A protein has these predicted regions:
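Catalytic machinery of carbohydrate-active enzymes
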Residues: 1-403
């Protein structure tokens, strides 16, 4: 059967044609909470909008702006706020769209800006509190992921500097300063006045309540069979030291007399003349576990100890985290600065003795003798010089039940 061109045209014309709907081009609103609340407007319609960023908990308008299509806007606040974002037609003032922060079931990426041991151990459990409150999926980046990934299998751990994808919100935990001025768009308040852990609670919008992390500990035996106490008399700054002359040796002798071995576990080597001079001489009658050994060995030493005695340093935070009874000696920082679950030994007469310069001054790490108020005077380091060994012994007796 043959067809002419005319017949084909007629056949085509007789076909019932389906009417396709016309495509309507509209602008699209996209919301995210990466380093703060953000509203993006995409689309071809030339139109102006009013965007409002509202703190729902305070019922407070934080930021309002006018936007066109193919622009984005955000307030500069990077810490958690329970945001509501509203978009209005500028011409009619009609509410066109809104979005309330809701992380349930979504990926939230939380990064730690610090590699310090204390910061990491203090801030990590707050992330767990955030997860439980918002029922979100946590992606986390720390400098010590190997301590935690087995303890928090429900989280995704990424290395520092690595990207995470398909995230709804991102928060960075840290102390953020610019020219010694707190950056209040990243930290809600001056962090030097707070417990270290509250830094994370504030940034993540949580009520502060001290909590401890779960941390992987080595499956190793006790370092010695006898009962023992760990000491860590060194720290990263001289101002952190316990400066009472002969104080550490007095404590060691007392513990030995009561039948306890004493393990010294600092990175600074026992027998090094310069380091020993900061302790009044080489400490005697200790088991030397100092030096560049793996941190896992120190964690194991602390975990099995009957007691840990240290300063405001990372090893004290490890002791707190692994739930070993802890005595923390410091006049350099105010008692609220570190953790509360310890015996905190502080300057005995704080009203008349200088103390807590850490909380009000900026440490000069290049000056080992830094003491902002009394350097080169007879009051140099008086904050810890005035802490007597008997005060420490009284705390030892309480923990070890020595009468």
């Amino acid at each position: 059967m043959s067809f002419t061109t005319d017949s084909l045209v007629k056949e085509y014309s007789n076909i019932t044609k389906k009417v396709l709907p016309s495509k309507t081009f509209e602008n699209k609103f996209i919301y995210s909470f990466i380093h703060g609340a953000k509203c993006e407007i995409f689309g071809p319609l030339e139109k102006e909008y009013i965007i409002k960023f509202i703190d729902k908990d305070k019922n407070e308008l934080i930021y309002e702006t006018v936007s066109k299509n193919n622009h984005w806007h955000k307030p500069n606040i990077e810490y958690f706020v329970n945001w509501r974002i509203e978009v209005y037609d500028k011409e009619t003032n009609e509410l066109l769209d809104s979005h309330d922060f809701d992380a349930e079931g979504k990926n939230v990426f939380i990064t730690l800006d610090s590699s310090a041991i204390g910061d990491t151990l203090a801030w990590l459990p707050v992330i767990k509190q955030f997860e439980e409150k918002h029922k979100c999926k946590i992606i986390v980046s720390t400098f010590h992921n190997d301590w935690f990934y087995k303890e928090y299998p429900e989280w995704e751990f990424v290395s520092p500097g690595m990207q995470a994808f398909d995230i709804y919100a991102l928060y960075c935990l840290g102390w953020f300063y610019n020219d010694q001025q707190i950056e209040l768009h990243k930290n809600p308040q001056e962090v030097k006045n707070l417990p270290l852990q509250q830094t994370a609670s504030d940034i993540l919008g949580l009520e502060y309540k001290e909590s401890k992390p779960r941390i992987s500990t080595p499956k190793k035996d006790r370092p010695v069979e006898e009962k023992y106490v760990c000491i860590a008399p060194h720290a990263s700054a001289h101002a952190k030291y316990w400066m009472y002359p002969g104080g550490w040796q007095t404590i060691i002798d007392y513990l030995n007399d009561k039948g306890y071995k004493v393990l010294m576990i600092t990175h600074e080597v026992l027998g090094d003349e310069w380091h020993d001079s900061k302790l009044g001489g080489t400490l005697q009658n200790v088991i030397d576990k100092t030096g560049n050994g793996p941190l896992s060995d120190r964690i194991n030493d602390i975990k099995h100890a009957d007691l840990f005695i240290g300063l405001g340093s990372g090893l004290s935070w490890i002791s707190w985290a692994v739930r070993t009874p802890t005595i923390l000696i410091s006049g350099f920082s105010a008692p609220h600065t570190e953790f509360q679950d310890c015996e905190r030994i502080f300057t005995p007469d704080p009203d008349n003795t200088c103390n807590s310069c850490f909380n009000r001054e900026w440490l000069n790490p290049g000056d080992w003798e830094w003491c902002p108020d009394h350097k080169d005077t007879d009051r140099h380091f008086e904050c810890s010089k005035t802490i007597e060994p008997q005060t420490v012994i009284n705390s030892i007796n309480k923990f070890l039940k020595i009468s």
